[in-house]
Amino acid sequence: MDHVYSFSEAKRFPPYKSVLTFEADACPLVPNWHRELSRAWDELAAPKDVKMFGARVEHPLPHINGNAMFSGDLKFLYWISRLIGGCDPTQGWDFRLARDFKREGWMDCPLIKSHWQKKTMSPDEIHSLRSSGVVLLHGVKDDSVIADTRKRFVG
C-alpha cells in the first residue's frame, strides 16, 4: 500500500480505483476473475464509498480478510500506509485493524471467499464455489485449487 500511495501521490501512477492484495495461498477460479472483481467494485463498493471489499470471516471475530480490494483514494492510502503503517506482529493485520477498517467502511465481497488453514479442497467443493459466483479463493494450503483451475482453463 505504501508503494501505491507514494507513486500515486507523486503522480507516477495513474489514479487507481482500488488495489487488490492477495497471498500465495489465494487462487483465481475463473479466467476473467480480475474483470469480475473490478465490476463488483464498481457496482457494489464504489457507490457506498467502501474502503475495504473482501471476504468477511467470523473467526475469531468478524473482519474482512486481507486478501481483498482496497480503495485507491489517496486519503485512505495515506491513512493505511503512513498513519497506520504496521501493527502488532502477534495477530493478523486484517484482524487487528478490523475496528479501524469497519469505521473507514468495509463490505463483504460475494466474489471472494476465504478459509482459515484449509488443508485441501475437493473438485466438487471448488465447482460449488465457482457455480455460486466465487472468482477468487484464499486459504487452501495445498495445490488442489490451482491444479483444478489449471486443468479446467489451461489444459
PLM region descriptions:
Residues 14-27:
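Short beta-strand-to-loop acidic/aromatic patch adjacent to the donor-nucleotide binding site
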Residues 8-10, 40, 44:
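Hydrophobic helix-cap positions at the C-terminus of alpha-helices
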Residues 28-32, 42-155:
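Catalytic core and acceptor-binding pocket of nucleotide-sugar-dependent glycosyltransferases
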Residues 1-17:
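Active-site-proximal specificity loops/subdomain of glycosyltransferases
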